[in-house]
Regions:
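Non-catalytic interface/linker regions that flank or bridge core catalytic/transmembrane domains
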Residues: 1-31
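Residue-level recognition of alpha-helical structural elements
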Residues: 12-15, 41, 68
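All-alpha helical catalytic cores of prenyl diphosphate-utilizing isoprenoid enzymes
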Residues: 18-25, 38-50
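Divalent metal-dependent catalytic cores for phosphoryl transfer on phosphate-bearing substrates
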Residues: 35-39, 47, 54, 58-170
């Protein structure tokens, strides 16, 4: 409810309604944000997205900036994780009983191996156009943890030097 409220209040450009309708056909609102780090729980992805939006607004937003851009970046930067995880089971030894038990865990089931930030941009642009600064911010929101940056690519540095919104989302 909070995500949809923030989204509808701030994101009004053409296609935004179609994007939200599509989101509701995915597991975005119930999916985890990761398999073992932040938000590795049911609804972790939507909670993480709201938290990033709130942090951006609280720490960086100033009068005259685009509230819509902040909402798009904060709420949709991890859109790539919709329909990305599946629940599997693994055997874990119960410390109390000494018995092996099947326990659920999240695992990656990437149906569109397009990268991380770039996949979010790709999915968003199926429905609505992004401003260049928004696309750059979402593409590089992982910073030095992005596979391209870890592989020696310097584009993230140039993106952060040129687009302040990218630094704020990271």
């Amino acid at each position: 409810a909070e995500f949809v409220e923030i989204y509808n209040k701030n994101i009004t450009r053409p296609g935004a309604d179609r994007l939200l309708n599509w989101l509701e056909t995915t597991d975005f609102f119930t999916a985890p944000a990761s398999t073992r780090f932040h938000g590795a729980c049911e609804c972790g992805l939507v909670m993480h997205s709201i938290n990033v939006y709130n942090a951006m607004m609280q720490h960086f937003f100033t009068e005259g900036e685009s509230a819509e851009s902040y909402a798009i970046c904060g709420l949709l930067h991890d859109l790539c994780k919709a329909n990305f995880y599946k629940v599997g089971t693994r055997n874990v030894k119960n410390d109390v009983t000494g018995q092996w038990e099947k326990v659920p865990f999240y695992q990656v089931a990437d149906q569109l191996p397009y990268g991380h930030g770039e996949k979010s941009v790709y999915l968003i642009e199926h429905f609505m156009r992004l401003k260049t600064a928004e696309a750059i911010a979402i593409r590089w929101h992982m910073g030095g943890f992005d596979d391209a940056a870890r592989g020696g690519c310097f584009a993230v540095s140039e993106a952060y030097n040129t687009y302040p919104l990218a630094v704020k989302l990271h």
